[in-house]
Amino acid sequence: MPQLDTSTWLTMILSMFLTLFIIFQLKISKHNFYYNPELTSTKMLKQNTPWETKWTKIYLPLLLPL
């Protein structure tokens, strides 16, 4: 049974990593990033609902006579 020749594996693996690194660098360099990001307000704006603008009263259920 012949022996598996692994002498070229190191160069193949290193060249693959180098190629992947270059490809990812080129992909990342094409993205546009904000130069000076500004903080945005995360506070929720209160929305007025119809029942908040009116006066409301909670009524108890009618008491049934015993």
Curated annotation (Swiss-Prot):
One of its GO terms (biological process) is proton motive force-driven ATP synthesis. Its main location: mitochondrion. InterPro entries: ATP8_mammal (IPR039017), ATP8_metazoa (IPR001421). The keyword Magnesium does not apply. The keyword Secreted does not apply. The chain crosses the membrane at residues 8-24. It is a single-pass membrane protein. GO terms for molecular function: proton transmembrane transporter activity. The modification N6-acetyllysine is found at residues 54, 57. GO terms for cellular component: mitochondrial membrane; proton-transporting ATP synthase complex. It comes from the Eukaryota. It is found in: Mitochondrion membrane. Pfam families: ATP-synt_8. Keywords: Acetylation, ATP synthesis, CF(0), Hydrogen ion transport, Ion transport, Membrane, Mitochondrion, Transmembrane, Transmembrane helix, Transport. The modification N6-succinyllysine is found at residue 54. Belongs to the ATPase protein 8 family. Component of the ATP synthase complex composed at least of ATP5F1A/subunit alpha, ATP5F1B/subunit beta, ATP5MC1/subunit c (homooctomer), MT-ATP6/subunit a, MT-ATP8/subunit 8, ATP5ME/subunit e, ATP5MF/subunit f, ATP5MG/subunit g, ATP5MK/subunit k, ATP5MJ/subunit j, ATP5F1C/subunit gamma, ATP5F1D/subunit delta, ATP5F1E/subunit epsilon, ATP5PF/subunit F6, ATP5PB/subunit b, ATP5PD/subunit d, ATP5PO/subunit OSCP. Subunit 8, of the mitochondrial membrane ATP synthase complex (F(1)F(0) ATP synthase or Complex V) that produces ATP from ADP in the presence of a proton gradient across the membrane which is generated by electron transport complexes of the respiratory chain. ATP synthase complex consist of a soluble F(1) head domain - the catalytic core - and a membrane F(1) domain - the membrane proton channel. These two domains are linked by a central stalk rotating inside the F(1) region and a stationary peripheral stalk. This is ATP synthase F(0) complex subunit 8. It comes from Bos mutus grunniens. The gene is MT-ATP8.
